[in-house]
Amino acid sequence: MVLDSSASWEPGDETADQSELLPEIARGVPLIKVLGVGGGGSNAVSRMYKDKLPVVEYYALNTDAQHLFRCDVGHRIALGQNLTRGLGSGALPDLGRQAAEESRSEIQQAVEGADMVFLAVGMGGGTGTGAAPVIAQIAKESGALTVAVVSRPFSFEASTRRKNADDGIGKLKDYVDTLITIPNDRLLELNRDNESTFTWEEALKMADSVLHQGIQAIAEVVTIPGEINVDFADVKTILNNAGPAWLAIGRGKGENRAIEAARQATKSPL
């Protein structure tokens, strides 16, 4: 079931999805679609939507209807309505896989026409872990450059969850052009100063935030003109059938901000 909450485009509205822009505005710009799968992925995409790019479409896909309705994104897809009745996957990846298979036609419609599809997934649960490989396969078969940015559970989480994540990542890599895996344990190194007071909720928010930053950064490179021109063809050359990749974050300010950010990125624990 597809739940579309996007508004129609009006002159002067720079926040509309690309599919709603006038043809002369959209021409020559790659169509990028970001799909958040499961609870963690949907949370990450909800964060992205608050700072949405005008030429990117955002989707949340989940088996948990209550969580899905709380997601503030342009498009929402309830996976496996007949199978799960909107009650979630019970942390069972096979149920997540079956839910995605049931909703295959809705997923195909979602990725149709996309030049590039990002998947944001928090691995280890049922929906994200089980559904992501199915969704990635559908996206890649549509002809889109398909990139997955996934998080791996913290080491202190249940062993079953960690095993589910490993199995899911192993399956997902066969259906994407590029797979960026973020080990959540390394996020703690980014927050060493506050490690003793770092709560579980803050840890999860940080994991969602890193998914957000990774996808948003790549999307901005090909949609926002900069001092150094990087077009979609350049990005496709780098990411097409690239396999495993790594994400690093660096920040800088002042006159030498680019150099400072690059140095920080090379030392990033991610």
PLM feature spans:
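Tubulin/FtsZ superfamily GTPase core signature
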Residues: 1-270
